[in-house]
Amino acid sequence: MPRGQKSKLRARGKRRETHDQPQGLTGPQATAEKQEESRSSSSSSAVCQGARRRSSGSSVPQESQGASPTGYPDAGASCSKYDVAAMGQDEKSPSTSRDASVSQESQGASPIGPPDAGISCSKSDEAAKGQNEKSPSTSRDASVPQESQGASPTGSPDADVSGSKSDVAAKGQDEESLSSSKRAAFFTTTDGDPIKRKANKMVQFLQKKFEKKEPILKADMLKRLRRQYKPCFPEILKRTSEHLTVFFGVELKETDSSGESYTLVSKLGLSNEGSLSGDNALPKSGLLMSILGLIFMRGNRATEEEVWKFLGLLGIYDGILHSIYGDARKIITEDLVQDKYVVYRQVCNSDPPCYEFLWGPRAYAETTKMRVLRVLAEINNTSPGLYPHLYEDALTDEVERALRLRA
């Protein structure tokens, strides 16, 4: 080879060497470094691919929260530890949200839920049922003292002895209310019962007849009825007799066997010259029956307060004119006192002054406690024996009267 060509080749080789030195190492060292770079790049790509798979699994809650389900194209290549940690938190958040949803559904009475929630709910339901099963027995136990507080049939002997007086007083109050209960019903409105309404009008008609001392005839009573009510005359006459007993303490009796004429007779056996005479004869007789009965039930004396309380049950009030009895205060404190049927006096040592009523001498002479008790029992469709202590008192009075007559 010519000398000039060899020199040119050597110059080219030197230029190549100088050109390859800044580009990197040569030989086996360079190949080793290239292998390390390839391994590192493959491992980083594997981590990013796993992160992508995890992010795709957690995309559902992100979408529900309004987050975008997709990312940038080169996000996988530049994936870092912070991205992996964030994705781990996202994976935890769905489970947390599920647990929270369980509590919300259980509060909202959702019919479905996770198995654990169902088990816990079933336990709470069983506990609630147990409490409900206990509650009836508790309520029954609680009802026992309530029943024992009101009219318990049993008790200790000491309690019976100490409560005997209060029992007698309670019985007296019950008898008082019983004697006025049916009477109060007669003073109620009668618009819904035409027979009762006709009976009330018949009572007013007979009252006027009696005060004028005119005969009471069946023909006159039939004239007061319209044609459609004439077949009901026996029932109307029966109701009229009941009303007369309740209002005035008198009964309607036939004066002859033909049944064409009637008269009014006192149920208490009072004389016609007494309470059944003069003005307001029937109202006086009715109020007298009420006052004598109350005095008897209250232990042979009744305060003025007790009298007005009793009359109030019948719709009779102090200072108010009654449609049947008129001025009740005048009758019981003046008329009946003057006729000596009742005694109206001030209670001893009462301050402020308090007044009471007692039977008068004329009442003791013309009637008896037994008659009064029988009338009250008849009004209430009962028998005198249903009032044991009153019946015993009335029997004692009968015996004393018989002994006085023998003497």
UniProtKB/Swiss-Prot annotation:
Membrane-spanning segments: none
Residues covered by the MAGE domain: 195-394
Biased amino acid composition, Basic residues: 1-16
Biased composition (Polar residues): 56-68, 94-109, 133-155
Alphabetical list of Pfam families matching this protein: MAGE, MAGE_N
InterPro entries xref list: MAGE, MAGE_N, MAGE_WH1, MAGE_WH2, MHD_dom
Source superkingdom: Eukaryota
Biased composition (Basic and acidic residues): 123-132
Single Gene Ontology BP annotation: negative regulation of transcription by RNA polymerase II
Region of interest (Disordered), residue spans: 1-185
GO CC terms of this entry: nucleus
PROSITE patterns: MAGE
Record's protein name: Melanoma-associated antigen B6B
Organism: Homo sapiens
GN (gene name): MAGEB6B
